[in-house]
Amino acid sequence: LQELKTVAQSFVDNLSQFLIKNVVAFRHGSVQHIAPEVGTRTGLRSIGKYLLTEDDVLQCRKFHDAIANSSWPIEEWGQQRRVNIRYFAEQDFYQVPAGCLQSKSISNLFFAGRNISSTEGAIASARVMGICLQTGYASGCMAAAEALGLSQNDAVKQVQNGQL
């Protein structure tokens, strides 16, 4: 594991230096935090207008501003690669609301993938590829709407209808 950690740290250092040197948007950037160990699935949590909870997942909660659907169970990985899987009702699903993608305190900051606003229990389900793709698309659409001065409600409706 130590060798992997060294390789990963080197990769992060090289990539950040490349971006700072070659991409104007990163000119004054810096790396503030990386995972403390190789294989860590979660870390610092973003705080959005809504916090997706473990209860939302297990109760298959639906939202009027839903931008993603998931039927993936909560999978919590422990030591020695042991996993505890908690399932919810068969043939049901939960939804991720748009509020999980927009910062609570910065109006033009949006989240996607493993960075959505959620508890540790909720992200143990929502960090899978399908949700990452759906939230990435929706977050980009919401950010574009913000930049164009459109309402977030209209952006969410357009995402829901596949119009963006």
Question: Each predicted region: which residue ranges?
Answer:
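Flavin (FAD/FMN)-binding glycine-rich loop and adjacent Rossmann-like elements that form
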Residues: 1-164
